[in-house]
């Protein structure tokens, strides 16, 4: 009898399979369609190209000086606000730092909160969070007729949550990590097909990194791939790196570590993703090895510091390119991944992937197989590497700036913050330019030995940070840059200095504009071609998120979170004075509090401040008796 039932069930599943696949295809096609509409901003980076580029040009370089605030919304929280809100079909979805509240706003009357989710979390998560209590955003899934449209979020205390996009009710909730060992969640979820992709945080506490795919409809785990360890844990495809065997193939997830050090070896991924439907690969980077003290973990420490291309359906890695073997500086390689299609120097159209890394190098790979196309310095002041050998993919180190125990490294450029960090940059496909926010910060590094204790910081270095050579080291200003980069020529069309690091990222538009926020609390617009500053506005607090844009009822809006914090703001947020505190950030940003203070919210601009409240009746109370 049981055999009969099993057979019938199997036949039923086969019969349902086409319908299930059809619903998946429908939902994915709808998400792609929504991402192409400039009314919406449905995922981090706007679309699967992850390019933060909009075709909108109602706001352009001839009229940008007319931008005025249209409306604002306070989240009620004061820690750093990273990422950007989502806009879908006339609603804005706003997220916050811990405790990771979520708000749905009606764009016809944004003062009206449609629903709000305020989770109760384990407060112990705060103690194991590195570098403020930030969160990088939300994801949207459009539903399939049976499952409602969802807003997906991560919580610092390890949970992944799916909320009904219309009501805010919890549809499912799963545990992704374990705060007892220091594993938290700060990453924005990423929806691909019928899966939501989730990374991990906690390398500073010796957390072993992994990437997980969950069924977006149920929260069931589909696959999990680790950054270190045996091949079966890494999910390496049979043809892994087959076209670039010199990058390394099987067995290296353990062989490049001493003993079982890979079990506490880091490699978490808390940054940004991209996806190519043509290759069906998800692109992302793994972070720094643990501990920071390189003496304690001999070897290349694969596959930390790696750009992976993983199959979205199986999780199998088709390629992996390790940018910084045996990282000595905490150059966690999780930064933004931006696909493009461009002609190379030989005139051949290539499917490319560009990634500005913490280590001071901006990489461009062939995204079909991971082959390295170019590797150029983010700034000519990078000194840890002399160059990158394009044949081997290996960086050529300058030993003077290494961090070994018998050598006190001074004036190391970039600092552990990198010349680029979590900011989400933009790519203008018409100009073939990447607009990148830069941290112009260097450091002194003093390593020390320490034991591993689960749930405690596992770093092993004291850092002192200060402005890079182009900044003002006496006054601790000039810690940032904004640059326009061509990946094919390896040249910079323009670059401009900023008082502080450009931490949040950029937005490029067809209006010939580049927008970005600054730590000292400005939203700025520059000319895409020249870098000339065309407009700026002082916002209530420093910005560590990136701007986004959308249209509603024919009006273009530009929005950005305000709320200083994150790694550069830890001194201000937690009132720290020791320059080596905050893993060295407090000293570098000692002047930040002179220019901004804490806040938390979103501010939305339009030409002449046009918006829903031009009608004075919008938002007004109406008596039921009238």
Swiss-Prot record:
Cited PROSITE patterns: BACTERIAL_PQQ_1 (PS00363), BACTERIAL_PQQ_2 (PS00364)
Disulfide bonds: 130-131, 413-442
Compartment(s) of residence: Cell inner membrane
Keyword Oxidoreductase: yes
CDD domains, alphabetized: PQQ_MDH
Catalysed reaction equations from the record: 2 Fe(III)-[cytochrome cL] + a primary alcohol = 2 Fe(II)-[cytochrome cL] + an aldehyde + 2 H(+)
Cofactor note: Binds 1 PQQ group per subunit. PQQ is inserted between disulfide Cys-130-Cys-131 and the indole ring of Trp-270. Binds 1 Ca(2+) ion per subunit.
Cofactor(s) recorded in Swiss-Prot or TrEMBL: pyrroloquinoline quinone; Ca(2+)
Entry annotated with the keyword Cell inner membrane: yes
Name of one Pfam family that matches: PQQ
Keyword annotations from UniProtKB, A to Z: Calcium, Cell inner membrane, Cell membrane, Disulfide bond, Membrane, Metal-binding, Methanol utilization, Oxidoreductase, PQQ, Signal
InterPro entries associated with the record: PQQ_b-propeller_rpt, PQQ_MeOH/EtOH_DH, PQQ_rpt_dom, Quinoprotein_ADH-like_sf, Quinoprotein_DH_CS
Major location (coarse): membrane
Domain of life: Bacteria
Binding positions for Ca(2+) per the UniProt entry: 204, 288
Family indicated by similarity: Belongs to the bacterial PQQ dehydrogenase family.
Subunit structure comment from the entry: Heterotetramer composed of 2 alpha and 2 beta subunits.
Name used for this protein in its record: Methanol dehydrogenase [cytochrome c] subunit 1
Source organism of this protein record: Methylobacterium organophilum
């Amino acid at each position: 009898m049981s055999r009969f039932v099993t057979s019938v069930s199997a036949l039923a599943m086969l019969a349902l399979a086409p319908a299930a696949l059809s619903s998946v295809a429908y939902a994915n096609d709808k998400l792609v369609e929504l991402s192409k509409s400039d009314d919406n901003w449905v995922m981090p980076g706007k679309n699967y190209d992850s390019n933060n580029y909009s075709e909108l040009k109602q706001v352009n370089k001839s009229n940008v000086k007319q931008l005025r605030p249209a409306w604002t919304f306070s989240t009620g929280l004061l820690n750093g606000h990273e990422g950007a809100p989502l806009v879908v079909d006339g609603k804005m979805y706003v997220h916050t730092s811990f405790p990771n509240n979520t708000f749905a706003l009606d764009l016809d009357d944004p003062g009206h909160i449609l629903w709000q989710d305020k989770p109760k979390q384990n407060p112990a998560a705060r103690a194991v969070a590195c570098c403020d209590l930030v969160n990088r955003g939300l994801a949207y899934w459009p539903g399939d007729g049976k499952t409602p449209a969802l807003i997906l979020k991560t919580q610092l205390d390890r949970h992944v949550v799916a909320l009904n996009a219309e009501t805010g009710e919890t549809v499912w909730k799963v545990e992704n990590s374990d705060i007892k060992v220091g594993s938290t969640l700060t990453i924005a979820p990423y929806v691909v097909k019928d899966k939501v992709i989730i990374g991990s945080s906690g390398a500073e506490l010796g957390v072993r990194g992994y990437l997980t795919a969950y069924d977006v409809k149920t929260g069931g785990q589909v696959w999990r791939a680790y950054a270190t360890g045996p091949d079966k844990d890494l999910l390496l495809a049979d043809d892994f790196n087959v076209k670039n065997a010199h990058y390394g193939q099987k067995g290296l997830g353990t062989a490049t570590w001493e003993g079982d050090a890979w079990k506490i070896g880091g490699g978490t991924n808390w940054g940004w993703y991209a996806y190519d439907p043509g290759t069906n690969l998800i692109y992302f980077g793994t972070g720094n090895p643990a501990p920071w003290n390189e003496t304690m973990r001999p070897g290349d420490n694969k596959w930390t510091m790696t750009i992976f291309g993983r199959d979205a359906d199986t999780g199998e890695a088709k390629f992996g390119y390790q940018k910084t073997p045996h990282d000595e500086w905490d150059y966690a390689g999780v930064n933004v991944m931006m696909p493009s299609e461009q002609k190379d120097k030989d005139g051949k159209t290539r499917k490319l992937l560009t990634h500005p890394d913490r280590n001071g190098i901006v990489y461009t790979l062939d995204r079909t197989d991971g082959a390295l196309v170019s590797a150029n310095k983010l700034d000519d002041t990078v000194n840890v590497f002399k160059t990158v050998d394009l044949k081997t993919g290996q960086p050529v180190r300058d030993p003077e700036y290494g961090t070994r125990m018998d050598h006190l490294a001074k004036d190391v450029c970039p600092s552990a913050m990198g010349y680029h960090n979590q900011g989400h940059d933009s790519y203008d496909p018409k100009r073939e330019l990447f607009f990148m926010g830069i941290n112009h910060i260097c450091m002194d590094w003093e390593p020390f030995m320490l034991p591993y204790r689960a749930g405690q910081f596992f770093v092993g270095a004291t850092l002192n940070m200060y402005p890079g050579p182009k900044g003002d080291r006496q006054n601790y200003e000039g810690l940032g840059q904004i640059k326009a980069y061509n990946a094919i020529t390896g040249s910079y069309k323009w670059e401009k200095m900023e008082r502080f690091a450009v931490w949040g990222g950029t937005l490029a538009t067809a209006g010939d504009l580049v927008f970005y926020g600054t730590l000292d609390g400005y939203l700025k617009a520059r000319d895409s071609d020249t870098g000339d500053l065309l407009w700026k506005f002082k916002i209530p607090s420093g910005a560590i998120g990136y701007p986004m844009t959308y249209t509603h009822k024919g009006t273009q809006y530009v929005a950005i979170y305000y709320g200083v914090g994150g790694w550069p703001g830890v001194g201000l947020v937690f009132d720290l004075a020791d320059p080596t505190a905050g893993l060295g950030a407090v000293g570098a940003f000692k002047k930040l509090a002179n220019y901004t203070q804490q806040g938390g919210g979103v501010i939305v601009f339009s030409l002449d401040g046009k918006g829903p409240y031009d009608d004075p009746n919008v938002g007004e109370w109406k008596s039921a008796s009238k």
